[in-house]
């Protein structure tokens, strides 16, 4: 059907959410990104609370994409390209439980594709993959100053190579 868009949503955690958001916002077919805190145990956490390590949240990037342009498999392939899925609670120089890697899905129908993708990537590493895969239970938007941070601050910190 011409003109019909097939929107899908996923949240990806890959260390500091600034770089993950900027990276995915540049991909054709991604129509929206937002950063926030995913799958913790407290209500409406602040950045400071998440950084203190007592909330259980990961820094995540909500991604809405048009599946008629880019599929979930391609989104996940790009995700694996920017993380080290064998390191627990760290990406680049960022260390802490909030910097763990994770794939958080809304649609249960996506789970098989996610697990297949994780299995495929595991064949490229000698160490086990520690990237968690969970259904989204909680997602709270991060404070406004975190949204599109690297667009507002082009020379800001980023652990991801955005020149790819």
Swiss-Prot record:
GO cellular component term of the entry, any: cytoplasm
Classification via InterPro entries: Met_Sox_Rdtase_MsrA_dom, Met_Sox_Rdtase_MsrA_sf, MsrA_MetSO_reductase
Catalytic activity of the protein: L-methionyl-[protein] + [thioredoxin]-disulfide + H2O = L-methionyl-(S)-S-oxide-[protein] + [thioredoxin]-dithiol; [thioredoxin]-disulfide + L-methionine + H2O = L-methionine (S)-S-oxide + [thioredoxin]-dithiol
Domain of life of the source: Bacteria
Any single Pfam family the record assigns to this protein: PMSR
Function: Has an important function as a repair enzyme for proteins that have been inactivated by oxidation. Catalyzes the reversible oxidation-reduction of methionine sulfoxide in proteins to methionine.
NCBIfam families cross-referenced by the UniProt entry: msrA
UniProt record similarity statement: Belongs to the MsrA Met sulfoxide reductase family.
Stated name of the protein: Peptide methionine sulfoxide reductase MsrA
Source organism of the structure: Clostridium tetani (strain Massachusetts / E88)
């Amino acid at each position: 059907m011409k003109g019909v868009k097939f929107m899908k949503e996923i949240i990806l955690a890959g260390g500091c959410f600034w770089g993950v958001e900027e990276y995915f916002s540049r991909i054709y077919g991604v129509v929206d990104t937002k950063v926030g805190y995913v799958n913790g145990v407290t209500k409406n956490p602040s950045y400071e609370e998440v950084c203190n390590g007592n909330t259980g949240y990961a820094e995540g990037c909500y991604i809405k994409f048009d599946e008629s342009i880019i599929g979930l498999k391609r989104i996940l392939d790009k995700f694996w390209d920017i993380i080290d899925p064998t390191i627990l609670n760290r990406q680049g120089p960022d260390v802490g439980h909030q910097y763990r890697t994770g794939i958080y899905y809304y649609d249960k129908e996506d789970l098989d594709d996610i697990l297949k993708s994780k299995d495929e990537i595991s064949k490229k590493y000698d160490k086990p993959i520690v990237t968690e895969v969970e259904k989204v239970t909680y997602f709270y938007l991060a404070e406004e100053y975190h949204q599109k941070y690297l667009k507002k601050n082009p020379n800001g910190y980023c652990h991801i190579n955005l020149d790819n």
